């Protein structure tokens, strides 16, 4: 078996990626989230496939087909809630994964980091089009508001919006194409995830100390496969608790009402994992400015390798930047809270302050703290 896995053309790839992969001996549980994201992706593709067998992407029957899945299909309610809450688990793991990358300086592996940003954007796009499919009130109005933002693009904006809608409003054509996008995008994510792994295995993993670990590597299996299995069991435990005990806690009550173009909900808001970006969008009174800020809130992650001037790798021995990092995390939580609040005083002002702080920390405070710490080392 040992010879086979090392010589067989297919098994050799698996062997180099998951069995004999040289891995730093000191990576912590924060490194588990990459494998958890892979598990989340598999859960989403499997549950999504079974949902797609019963779902109809037609405005007259979409809402009813989801109700039919929950009521008449064997374990349809479980598949639906695993899929809906699986998306939340996916984004929790994604945010922690990115947060760990920032904290431990994984962005210096620039190819892996940039493919990760593409993965992040593709996952957000998949989640957005998927949220539209149940055709509830918030699904419909969320789709209308977010797609309508493209009209802020000069010259081609209005034409682009109508082209995406497939008409003059969000209707049957929009739902059909969103279903098509939602079906194909996870497979594109899978392809990008393999590229992400390919680049990662070219350079090797980072580690908590930020030091070179070439002299202290251990095989991935059995040490980290066992460690990953523990993480997977914990992930499944939390997912099952969510799906079985609190299935609708992260959803929106407006989505229990079928989509009605003549009745606008009091507060239009996306799913919780988009609220930080939505708060940044709303904090700028100008439409085009808001759209640019929204895009930059994600794309600014690509600036981390460029703005990094530190002589040290990661934040483990850098108390000044650590303080700024945790302020950044707290600020993100504030933005998430603000995104779910109505557009009125004092929430608008808090949102504007938090949005300015978000960009200030990344563009100004982190590079400045890097320079300060570099000078402290010289003393």
Swiss-Prot record:
Bound cofactor: record note: Binds 2 heme b groups non-covalently.
One GO cellular component term noted in the UniProt record for this chain: respiratory chain complex III
InterPro entries: Cyt_b/b6_C (IPR005798), Cyt_b/b6_C_sf (IPR036150), Cyt_b/b6_N (IPR005797), Cytb/b6-like_sf (IPR027387), Cytochrome_b (IPR030689), Cytochrome_b_C_euk/bac (IPR048260), Cytochrome_b_N_euk/bac (IPR048259), Di-haem_cyt_TM (IPR016174)
UniProt-annotated location(s): Mitochondrion inner membrane
Keyword Membrane in annotation: yes
GO terms (BP aspect): mitochondrial electron transport, ubiquinol to cytochrome c
Phenotype when changing residue 108 to A: In strain: Isolate MVZ 174053 and Isolate MVZ 174054
Binding-site positions, a ubiquinone: 201
Cysteine disulfide links: none
PROSITE patterns per UniProt: CYTB_CTER, CYTB_NTER
Listed transmembrane segments: 33-53, 77-98, 113-133, 178-198, 226-246, 288-308, 320-340, 347-367
Pfam families in alphabetical order: Cytochrom_B_C, Cytochrome_B
Keyword presence, Ubl conjugation: no
Oligomer and partners: The cytochrome bc1 complex contains 11 subunits: 3 respiratory subunits (MT-CYB, CYC1 and UQCRFS1), 2 core proteins (UQCRC1 and UQCRC2) and 6 low-molecular weight proteins (UQCRH/QCR6, UQCRB/QCR7, UQCRQ/QCR8, UQCR10/QCR9, UQCR11/QCR10 and a cleavage product of UQCRFS1). This cytochrome bc1 complex then forms a dimer.
Function summary: Component of the ubiquinol-cytochrome c reductase complex (complex III or cytochrome b-c1 complex) that is part of the mitochondrial respiratory chain. The b-c1 complex mediates electron transfer from ubiquinol to cytochrome c. Contributes to the generation of a proton gradient across the mitochondrial membrane that is then used for ATP synthesis.
Family: Belongs to the cytochrome b family.
Protein name per the record: Cytochrome b
């Amino acid at each position: 078996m040992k010879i086979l896995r090392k010589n067989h053309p297919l098994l050799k790839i698996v062997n180099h990626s998951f069995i004999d992969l040289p891995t730093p001996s000191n990576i912590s549980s924060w490194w588990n989230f990459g494998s958890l994201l892979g598990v989340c992706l598999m859960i989403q593709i499997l549950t999504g496939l079974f949902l797609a067998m019963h779902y109809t992407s037609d405005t007259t029957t979409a809402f009813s087909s989801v109700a039919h899945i929950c009521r008449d299909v064997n374990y349809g309610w479980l598949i639906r809630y695993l899929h809906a809450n699986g998306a939340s688990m996916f984004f929790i793991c994604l945010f922690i994964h990115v947060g760990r990358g920032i904290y431990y300086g994984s962005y210096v592996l620039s190819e892996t980091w940039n493919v990760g940003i593409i993965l992040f954007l593709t996952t957000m796009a998949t989640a957005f089009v998927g949220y539209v499919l149940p055709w509830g009130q918030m699904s419909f109005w969320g789709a209308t508001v977010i797609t309508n933002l493209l009209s802020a693009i000069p010259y081609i904006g209005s034409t682009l919006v109508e082209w995406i809608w497939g008409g003059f409003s969000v209707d049957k054509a929009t739902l059909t194409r969103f279903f098509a996008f939602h079906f194909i995008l996870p497979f594109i994510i899978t392809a990008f995830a393999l590229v992400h792994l390919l680049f990662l295995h070219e350079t090797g993993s980072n580690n908590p100390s930020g030091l070179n670990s070439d002299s202290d590597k251990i095989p991935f299996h059995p040490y980290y496969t066992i460690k990953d299995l523990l993480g997977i069991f914990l992930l499944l435990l939390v997912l099952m608790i969510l799906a079985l005990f609190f299935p609708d806690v992260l959803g929106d009550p407006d989505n229990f009402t079928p989509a009605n173009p003549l009745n606008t909900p009091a507060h239009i808001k996306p799913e919780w994992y988009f609220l930080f970006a939505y708060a940044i969008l709303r904090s700028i009174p100008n439409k085009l400015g808001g759209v640019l800020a929204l895009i930059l809130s994600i794309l600014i992650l690509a600036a981390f390798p460029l703005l990094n001037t530190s002589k040290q790798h990661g934040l483990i021995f850098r108390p000044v930047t650590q303080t700024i990092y945790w302020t950044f995390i707290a600020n993100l939580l504030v933005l998430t809270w603000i995104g779910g609040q109505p557009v009125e005083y004092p929430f608008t002002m808090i949102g504007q302050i938090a949005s300015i702080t978000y960009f200030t920390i990344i563009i100004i405070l982190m590079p400045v703290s890097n320079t300060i710490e570099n000078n402290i080392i010289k003393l």
